[in-house]
Amino acid sequence: KLAGSEYALEEIIAAGIANCKRACAPYGALAALDVGPLGELLEPNGTLAFEDAVAEYGRIVRAGVAAGADLVFFETFTDLYELKAALLAAKENCDLPILASMSFEAGGRTFTGCTVESFAVTARGLGANAVGINCSLGPKEIFPMAKRLAEALPGDFPVFVKPNAGLPRADGSGYDITPQLFAMEMKPYRDLKLFAAGGCCGTTPDFIKLLNGVFADCKPGRPAHAMPSVLCSPMDFVTVDGITVVGERINPTGKKRFQQALREGDMNYILEQAVSQSEAGAQVLDVNV
């Protein structure tokens, strides 16, 4: 994105953190290195290699650390694979607290198909110190997803939200939710005992001022609850708390046709085995080759 710019990435980050620290100083607030997606899809959906994404995020994080950032905030991610690259890069290049946030569509998934639960489990497992949901939708639409996010995590694990001010108006005159309506629609979030709440696209200082009043007497921390073992892919989530059906046919032992498919690179045959097991009710696939 900086192609053709006269400034280096490190210069822009240093200037941004310096400006943020000056603005935060009177309030004792923290300055975050706020990082979004790289703007290029990772393989196999795009052309960016996972290792290259890790390297690029590592460069960004190192620049933020050198500039004096107090924490790292990854937000508006829609690809769990890319968020994984970002979190690995942060853990490898700094000891700062890390917040991770994804943006979900109205159906409860990101545009790459990631579920709320898969995000929660993966981000926590990769070392994020807090997780949340931001952008795309307003408070009312995000609330059911925020509730699922909180339920997928231990009670003492920090959760936050940053909804939009609704949707942008077609005439370009702003967003369809006023500060007063935003504050009213944020009241149900009090029951989630959030670590933090804020606003994303379309929100202004007027929104945040009223939001502060909504949460002024709230304390973070949800009741403790038992956390079952879970398995997940970006698009599915399985709780292992009883009988879990595992498909084990993706295994060449004693299967001549499968062995032939492996030798010939016949991935269609192997994929058929996976699909047939899924359609038969398998919740998990054991790939043993």
What are the roles of these predicted feature ranges?
Residues 1-289:
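Domain-level signal for soluble alpha/beta catalytic cores
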